[in-house]
Amino acid sequence: MSIASVASVFNGDHAVGSQVTVRGWVRTRRDSKAGISFLALYDGSCFDPIQGVIPNNLPNYDDEVLKLTAGCSLVMTGDVVESPGAGQAFELQVTAVEVTGWVDDPDTYPMAAKRHSIEHLRELAHLRPRTNIIGAVARVRNCLSQAIHRFYHEQGFIWVSTPLITASDCEGAGEMFRVSTLDMENLPRTDAGKVDYDKDFFGKESFLTVSGQLNAETYACALSKVYTFGPTFRAENSNTTRHLAEFWMVEPEVAFATLDDAAKLAEDMLKYAFNAVLNERMDDLSFFNERVDKTVIERLQAFVSSDFAQVDYTDAVEILKNCGKKFEFAVEWGIDLQSEHERYLAEEHFKAPVVVKNYPKDIKAFYMRLNDDGKTVAAMDVLAPGIGEIIGGAQREERLDVLDARLAEMELSQEDYWWYRDLRRYGTVPHAGFGLGFERLVSYVTGVNNIRDVIPFPRAPRSASF
């Protein structure tokens, strides 16, 4: 007897006639008049449950098997046989069932075998992994994560753990969560009446990071090719399907790289990750294609076979102004492109993923390299058909005098970024990178359009349960 995952049985890893033990939870049970019960058991290793055919001569058939309901956990042993029914190649002729956990009250079990709205499932985040849709999201999320790590490993990158607590605001937007151990009921004050952060744990104002980029740059300027993959935080009071207060970012940084190098890296990474999902998780993709978005598989296949288009921001604005389409947000040079503009470019004009580059400096961060025209910076956004922006990146400003001028323009303190400026003082080097919002990627791949449904425990305004 061997312990087997449901996926390994379906993959044919166990010969027909061999005895295996599977462990998991009941999806459904139905009983025939012939004295046989059919049990669907899932263990999360793949989308489909395995069917166990249970005869009524088992010693615990009447007392336990006939009382099994959705959610009960058990260990099931049986012989692998070819399934006569459609839908799966193998099933188990069960020889033993051991119940390990009962559902206290099947009538009130929230995950009983009925379809729930995805909004309702959000209120049951501790139980929703048991549903088909959230289980499938979890497997696809894992597949994408593993593929991204594998891609960078194969490309010779070094993974860097950047800090979650920081004193720097990477985006300069100020939308940061403060980290403090001060007594909120009795805050220490300076003579000027301001909060005295010198009395705080770190001796200064500290925050949860909005990006690992600045820290990653320090390692790229020593190790050449690095990336960070971890949680980031934004105190942005946005209740939309596209925003979270806590989300994961993939951020590579490459020394001696240009903006075009970063664009090529982004294209290669996305295609690698999408191919991995198409090759490894077609069972889950088929579910999403059938139940969530009928274009999921076609969209991914088209993406990996497309050449990325490239367009300057200035030219993109002209395309949008002259396309004859009425947008909710007016288009003029100097605006930040809205989702409707991005999707028009990717879906209707180029009909392919597109890299928009060289944005106006006034709408971009201080660290982006100033172009020779003095008006634009070497920044890019990767736009994908079906979602819009999926990656944002830039060549970094490696010239200290220009960086200092940008800090002054944006009224940011040189003192706060002393260590970042040091990189430009000691062996400065051109370098570039980008940020990929991981949940945005999972949403794109699965077709699940609310970003709160592609992360296990979403954190958003007035939402921090579990």
Swiss-Prot record:
It catalyses: tRNA(Asn) + L-asparagine + ATP = L-asparaginyl-tRNA(Asn) + AMP + diphosphate + H(+). HAMAP family: Asn_tRNA_synth (MF_00534). CDD domains: AsxRS_core, EcAsnRS_like_N. Homodimer. One of its GO terms (biological process) is asparaginyl-tRNA aminoacylation. One of its GO terms (molecular function) is asparagine-tRNA ligase activity. PROSITE patterns: AA_TRNA_LIGASE_II. Pfam families: tRNA-synt_2 (PF00152), tRNA_anti-codon (PF01336). It comes from Shewanella denitrificans (strain OS217 / ATCC BAA-1090 / DSM 15013). GO terms for cellular component: cytoplasm. Its main location: cytoplasm. NCBIfam families: asnS, PRK03932.1. Its EC number is 6.1.1.22. Keywords: Aminoacyl-tRNA synthetase, ATP-binding, Cytoplasm, Ligase, Nucleotide-binding, Protein biosynthesis. This is Asparagine--tRNA ligase. Disulfide bonds: none annotated. The lineage of its organism: Bacteria, Pseudomonadati, Pseudomonadota, Gammaproteobacteria, Alteromonadales. Belongs to the class-II aminoacyl-tRNA synthetase family.
